[in-house]
């Protein structure tokens, strides 16, 4: 199977999330839990941002939390799906909308093509969104471009063990992608370094959701818009026989009467380095340190 088979069809992603905007919140249990854990991590960071970007905002709960936390900040809610942005902006109260107490803005765009000025953002936040990017170098390069010097990127995404049970149950041959491919934590760290970020910190956490049957797994994925959007996916109807085969294979994972769905969640944060001062040709910086005092 070629690498192109794993490329994400962005038009399909947009349509899927547009359709899922009304059902997303009820099914996004994992996304909520990860968001709260990211907010706890943010408690440890001393930051007073003037501008915050919520990249891949979904229905906007993180945007609201960031706006409440940083009340003097402009918060930009960015998503590829207009349906999600409409939910985000509709959630603002009437008073906030009439009197401008809520300093939030909505932008429909792709993380890989940010329509924002260079060095305009202090904090980029992204909860479980960058797995929908085709080119991680491009995505991190864009984030690094829009961050101000000493700006912070804080994100979560999905690792390669995500939905490993479903991947095993749906595997047919080596010609079609049945579950999206997710990037390893070490490769993400390498991409951050290539993009110019300072000393990225990453760690991983595993979550297991349980279901009565495989259709419950499928329903939740559909409700949050997480369809298989790989270019190498099977394009036709696969029929009742294939579904029965998937159900039978998934049963091999049943434990204590439940079917598991594993999610590997990768957390990361990294800083954009301070801008360097350009010196005339032939000059180099000299660092002075105070001489240690000595007693006589």
UniProtKB/Swiss-Prot annotation:
NCBIfam families in the record: BioC (TIGR02072)
Name of the protein: Malonyl-[acyl-carrier protein] O-methyltransferase
Gene: bioC
Pathway(s) the chain acts in: Cofactor biosynthesis; biotin biosynthesis
Enzyme Commission number(s) of this protein: 2.1.1.197
Similarity comment text for this entry: Belongs to the methyltransferase superfamily.
UniProt keyword annotation of S-adenosyl-L-methionine present: yes
InterPro entries according to UniProt: BioC, Malonyl-ACP_OMT, Methyltransf_11, SAM-dependent_MTases_sf
A GO molecular-function descriptor: S-adenosylmethionine-dependent methyltransferase activity
Protein purpose: Converts the free carboxyl group of a malonyl-thioester to its methyl ester by transfer of a methyl group from S-adenosyl-L-methionine (SAM). It allows to synthesize pimeloyl-ACP via the fatty acid synthetic pathway.
Keyword annotations from UniProtKB, A to Z: Biotin biosynthesis, Methyltransferase, S-adenosyl-L-methionine, Transferase
EC category name: transferase
Organism: Methylovorus sp. (strain MP688)
Reactions that this protein is recorded to catalyse: malonyl-[ACP] + S-adenosyl-L-methionine = malonyl-[ACP] methyl ester + S-adenosyl-L-homocysteine
């Amino acid at each position: 199977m070629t690498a192109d088979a794993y490329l994400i069809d962005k038009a399909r992603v947009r349509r899927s999330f547009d359709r899922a905007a009304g059902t997303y919140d009820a099914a996004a249990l994992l996304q909520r839990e990860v968001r709260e854990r990211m907010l706890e991590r943010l408690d440890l960071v001393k930051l007073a941002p003037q501008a915050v970007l919520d990249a891949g905002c979904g229905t906007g709960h993180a945007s609201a939390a960031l706006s409440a936390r940083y009340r003097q900040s402009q918060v930009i809610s960015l998503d590829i799906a207009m349906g999600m942005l409409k939910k985000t902006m509709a959630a603002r109260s009437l008073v906030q909308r009439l009197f401008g107490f809520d300093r939030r803005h909505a932008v429909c765009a792709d993380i890989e093509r940010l329509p924002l000025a260079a060095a305009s953002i202090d904090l980029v936040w992204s909860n479980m969104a960058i797995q929908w990017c085709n080119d991680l170098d491009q995505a991190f390069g864009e984030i690094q471009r829009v961050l101000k010097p000493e700006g912070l990127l804080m994100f979560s995404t999905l690792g390669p063990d995500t939905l490993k049970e479903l991947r095993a149950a749906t595997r047919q041959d080596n010609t079609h992608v049945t579950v999206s491919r997710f990037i390893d934590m070490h490769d993400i760290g390498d991409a951050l370094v290539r993009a110019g970020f300072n000393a990225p910190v990453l760690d991983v956490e595993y979550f297991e959701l349980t279901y009565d049957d495989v259709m419950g797994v499928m329903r939740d994925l559909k409700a949050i818009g997480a369809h298989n959007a790989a270019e190498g996916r099977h394009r036709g109807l696969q029929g009742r026989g294939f579904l029965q085969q998937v159900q039978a294979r998934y049963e091999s994972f049943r434990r204590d009467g439940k079917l598991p769905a594993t999610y590997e969640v990768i957390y990361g944060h990294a800083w954009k380095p301070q801008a360097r001062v350009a010196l005339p040709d032939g000059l180099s910086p000299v660092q002075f340190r105070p001489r240690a005092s000595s007693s006589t």
